[in-house]
Amino acid sequence: MREPDPQRGEHSRSCAQRQGKSFRGYIAASLSLIAVFAASGAPYPLYERYRIEEGLSTGDLSWATVSYLFAVLATLLVFGQISDYLGRKPVTLAALVLAALGSAVLLHLNGMMVLILGRVLQGAACGLAASATQAYVLDTAPRHPTWLGAATATNVSQIGIVLGTLGGGFLAWSSPSPEQAPMLASIMLTVLALLLVIAADHDPVGRRSGAMTSLRPVVAIPQAARPLIVASAGVFISTWALTGFYQSFAPTISATYLGTRNPVMAALVIASVVGPQPFGAAVRGRIPVRKAQVYGSVTFAFAVSAIAFGLYRHSAPLVIGSGLIAGLSQGVGYTASVRMLLDKVTGDQHAGLMSAISMISYIGSAVPSFIAGQLSLVMFLQTIATGYVGLAAAGALLIIGIRHRTT
């Protein structure tokens, strides 16, 4: 009978211990990603209440959205690589602290500047999480199934926004302290995630020198990707513009055009566009990438048209149903466009290209939101929505025209 090999047994136990530490890190990182983005989604259903109770205008609300978006973008561009030098855990902890501080600021809102400060802090938290915490998830995900890490890293942030928005809407509706309850829940969730990250003693990236040099933004569109960037930018701008419109005005849309100030309805309106986007990314995998870009952008344009028509008809089912289709088609078109660009470049060019994609997307959301906010002072939102129809149609026609010219 063969004697057991003590060295092999010790090696197996060591591997199991490392896998256990890694899995705890994966759970902590995943919950952190949810917590940070849930905190950013929690205030959205309260925007109409802020407008009425604090005397804010729709223009003020759009400023809050623009400030949030630019905070995400600036943090992502400047600090996007910092966790490669300081480690995943410290930067994830910083993201959680910023998210909790943003929620704490919004606990006692008393004016526009407080709202903007809270949203900037939450935006900075999301910028750190979108880089460091997503990388933390990828680094600690179990090896099997092989798709789990990528699926978690790319989709959990959207899930967090939806959970935060729906949870914030429900708490604002059911709690005697509608403005405080969503923020307190967000703080509790971020503290729980923070404790789990501290307890997860495995950091997949050690501290090393060079952190200051990493603060230089790397934004580049490699030569090989440039023929595709115009069409892809049309998708990025038109789809993210609609998301920014909903983030700024969904509660006001619900109150003015759908006949209810219930924050749960406002949350459903926002979630109808944001929630289906990860499913659209999954659908894209079943469609050839070039066709997916065209199908996604054309379907998106029709869905935005239906949303605008639903606003004119004051139809909640049409607005929400069309929002679901818009979110799904956005996921299809956006991921197809990103995939087409990445397929044209080498691995060492991914970081600069992804920074360029992020910059186009966030600016494409922030600038139309700012313009819409100023127009909302003199125009009805349903009229402004037709401008987004034109933007979506322009994006679809641009893609069709470029594809027709190159075939």
Locate the predicted segments by residue.
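Helix-loop-helix hairpin linking two adjacent transmembrane segments in secondary transporters
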Residues: 144, 148-198
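Conserved MFS/SLC helix-loop-helix module at the cytosolic interface between two early adjacent transmembrane helices
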Residues: 73-112
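Cytoplasmic helix-loop-helix junction between adjacent transmembrane helices
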Residues: 118-157
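C-terminal transmembrane helical hairpin of 12-TM major facilitator-type secondary transporters
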Residues: 291-335
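A late C-terminal transmembrane helix in Major Facilitator Superfamily
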Residues: 330, 337-384, 388-389
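Paired small-residue
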Residues: 102, 113-122, 317-325
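Helix-breaking motifs and short loop linkers at transmembrane-helix boundaries and internal kinks
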Residues: 55, 87, 108-113, 310-314
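Transmembrane alpha-helices of Major Facilitator/SLC transporters
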Residues: 265-289, 303
